[in-house]
Amino acid sequence: MNPDLRKERAAATFNPELITHILDGSPENTRRRREIENLILNDPDFQHEDYNFLTRSQRYEVAVKKSATMVKKMREFGIADPEEIMWFKKLHMVNFVEPVGLNYSMFIPTLLNQGTTAQQEKWMHPSQELQIIGTYAQTEMGHGTHLRGLETTATYDPKTQEFILNSPTVTSIKWWPGGLGKTSNHAIVLAQLITRGECYGLHAFVVPIREIGTHKPLPGITVGDIGPKFGYEEMDNGYLKMDNYRIPRENMLMKYAQVKPDGTYVKPLSNKLTYGTMVFVRSFLVGSAAQSLSKACTIAIRYSAVRRQSEIKRSEPEPQILDFQTQQYKLFPLLATAYAFHFLGRYIKETYMRINESIGQGDLSELPELHALTAGLKAFTTWTANAGIEECRMACGGHGYSHSSGIPNIYVTFTPACTFEGENTVMMLQTARFLMKIYDQVQSGKLVGGMVSYLNDLPSQRIQPQQVAVWPTLVDINSLDSLTEAYKLRAARLVEIAAKNLQAQVSHRKSKEVAWNLTSVDLVRASEAHCHYVTVKVFADKLPKIQDRAVQAVLRNLCLLYSLYGISQKGGDFLEGNIITGAQMSQVNSRILELLTVTRPNAVALVDAFDFKDVTLGSVLGRYDGNVYENLFEWAKKSPLNKTEVHESYYKHLKPLQSKL
């Protein structure tokens, strides 16, 4: 164990194990998660190949092998609970993206959300056993987030009771679905439904694309891999072109919308019901943002405690770089953000489960807010985590650029989340659409509930400058209630500004669509403010439920740091709205620096509490034992370029050149 890391852990003011229990949901969850992790670590079939030294084809093969082993082992160990499956996959796949992943994250959830009982009976068991390997084919070459623009067609033929699937243009070719290129034999395809000469919009169809047994593409199907990408090298993101490809009528998922044998269309109770899978995945991505940012913080903070560089006082030993205030200012707000997103991820997951249960009983009243909240928070958390991971990499100096640090892989694997499952700016605008509707309802005298209830205060003009002039004297920068209120006022103000600017554009005889585009920067700002408020509120609301005083104190400081750092970064909004004064902004900045000092003794223990195994981090710099330099040298020796003392290119190109000189 590196002596600096041993000293850091001994200096902590709390027991990290207690925070691990909180993050896992309970001590029993922690026990069970570790039990599952040990099943893998102690299994001779579990091999961890260093993906950094593999070709793309090798990475794909290893990932497929791991996926197959994973399914066999889950059967062997009797792992069936969704949360336990997630724990198992995380450690078993390590830093490999699984080519069969969309079978579990999209194909099966879509069957559950949109399939009838008969359809679930037909396809669920084979897909769980990987007889059917499914993917989710929505995105096309020419359209992604704009679903209405998708061009793939499914035309119903009542004579044969079949749908005829076509990719009528180059831009209509399905493009990007994970696992489509080489792995999947079925896809849930989103296509424009045409029956009796009329188009009824997007619907989901279960489409066999490869023959089971031979795995060869079926007639009428053109399918393949789209080529190398920024990351995800082991994932076979693919393309799919369909030419007059016929599937039975029963392959349309018909839990909500239906097509009768004669071609009659039966519309769903709500069009939003078909967005179930996207809402599920977006809610999952909030937790994924927390996980990825936590990994990067763990690596950067441990390494910053091990790395000694430069000097603060002359003639003294080189300090740990974690002692530099600038390093703390880079990393500790990100650590606080990782914790905020952990609690937010759990909140959104529980909210999704609760509302999904209500939807199952026919109550759709909370669906619009759930749709808006998951869209906005998906964008807010993935943007923030994406930038934070890169900040962690740069905080590791030159070694952060090496794949040995593990952070480049975390970054390239996470960054697509800013565009997949809805491009982030468009997601923010979806949230804004909901906020504008709520604003209009409040203006017409209706009281609203949920996370937007703060807009009820607008008609009383409590957010107008003359009314808020007294507010600055009440702001207590050490009170989380007071800071949550400040975020609430910022959100309300920016929602109102966006709404009034939108109305002004419409009153200038602009069409609603043009007015929306001309107000879109304000609308995104309003959504971001709403999401920021929700995050602060969820984090602050979690603290009173924590029993241990030492743990509560540490997390309270992180929550304060998260809230105050956000105010300093968005200072213009708080100052313009007279929510805080210039003098208070100076206090905020001073308090942030104090909180860095307070957090410093607990920084390593706080990342230890995430409880990542070294094999999960895949990092030489972020090792639990802190033995960085010895292992960095050993890692470099594994480079394929070092297999020979003299590379063959020397004999081919350099030696002939030198002999002629």
Curated annotation (Swiss-Prot):
E.C. number: 1.3.3.6
Q: Which CDD domains match?
A: AXO (cd01150)
Residues the record lists as binding FAD: T139, G178
Q: Is Secreted a UniProt keyword of this protein?
A: no
N6-succinyllysine, modified sites: K89, K90, K159, K241, K349, K437, K446, K512, K542, K637, K643, K655
Q: Which terms are listed as keywords in the entry?
A: Acetylation, FAD, Fatty acid metabolism, Flavoprotein, Lipid metabolism, Oxidoreductase, Peroxisome, Phosphoprotein
Enzyme class comes to oxidoreductase
Tell me which Gene Ontology terms the entry assigns under biological process.
alpha-linolenic acid metabolic process; fatty acid beta-oxidation; fatty acid catabolic process; fatty acid derivative biosynthetic process; fatty acid oxidation; generation of precursor metabolites and energy; hydrogen peroxide biosynthetic process; long-chain fatty acid biosynthetic process
Q: Which GO terms describe its cellular component?
A: cytoplasm; cytosol; mitochondrion; peroxisomal matrix; peroxisomal membrane; peroxisome
* Catalytic residues as annotated in Swiss-Prot or TrEMBL: E421
Q: Establish whether keyword Ligase is in the entry.
A: no
Motif Microbody targeting signal, which positions?
A: 659-661
Q: In which tissues is it expressed?
A: Highest levels of isoform 1 are found in liver and kidney while highest levels of isoform 2 are found in white adipose tissue. Isoform 1 is expressed at higher levels than isoform 2 in liver and kidney while isoform 2 is expressed at higher levels in brain, heart, lung, muscle, white adipose tissue and testis.
Q: Which reaction does it catalyse?
A: a 2,3-saturated acyl-CoA + O2 = a (2E)-enoyl-CoA + H2O2; hexadecanoyl-CoA + O2 = (2E)-hexadecenoyl-CoA + H2O2; dodecanoyl-CoA + O2 = (2E)-dodecenoyl-CoA + H2O2; octanoyl-CoA + O2 = (2E)-octenoyl-CoA + H2O2
Q: Where in the cell is it found?
A: Peroxisome
Which positions bear Phosphoserine?
A: S26, S649
> Which residues are marked as site: Cleavage?
V468, A469
UniProt GO MF annotations: acyl-CoA oxidase activity; FAD binding; fatty acid binding; palmitoyl-CoA oxidase activity; PDZ domain binding; protein homodimerization activity
Q: What is its main location?
A: other
Pathway it works in:
Lipid metabolism; peroxisomal fatty acid beta-oxidation
| Alphabetical list of InterPro entries matching this protein | ACO, ACOX_C_alpha1, Acyl-CoA_ox_N, Acyl-CoA_Oxase/DH_mid-dom, Acyl-CoA_Oxase/DH_mid-dom_sf, Acyl-CoA_oxidase, Acyl-CoA_oxidase_C, AcylCo_DH-like_C
Oligomeric state and partners?
A: Homodimer. Interacts with LONP2.
Query: What protein name is recorded for this chain?
Result: Peroxisomal acyl-coenzyme A oxidase 1
- Species assigned in the record: Mus musculus (Mouse)
